[in-house]
């Protein structure tokens, strides 16, 4: 299958975390290629200091996501991440980490994203700091990526900015709003898929990805 599903995301986006199991299932069952593009929603100038208002808003949304998807947002995460006003809502380091993985073992970038998400939302770890992310990458055996992240060379920052710029350009071209966003690319043509469908009608979303009938999808599954 020559199709590619481009996944527009931010590592600190709760809805992106909620979408992860469905994305993994669709990629595994259909064989569609997966390309990750970070949008920089909470990176760089998009980063925000944490305060109680933001923490409360995030936790309320997180509970909705957990109810809808079954993804865990632990009390440890609430207490150690959201209630830690010294820990900003800043995905800069996590986005750099994923670019380092994309440069060294691109086939494992989605796996690394899932592990970063779990570290934050389940384990309550601080994934806004480079040293924590370096340890996380080493724990996955992504030694080259960890080395690149630790060096934090200008080239890594430039590559990350290029990915963010590409994501933003794609979003503007297709009038995409927010993350997660999904673009199916097939033989030079690209089409924005409704991300809400992934949560409400995942099987129909899979059909949209494949461009096939329900009966054909059933045979794949």
Question: How should these model regions be labeled?
Answer:
Residues 17-121, 220:
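Structural alpha/beta surface segment adjacent to cysteine/selenocysteine redox centers
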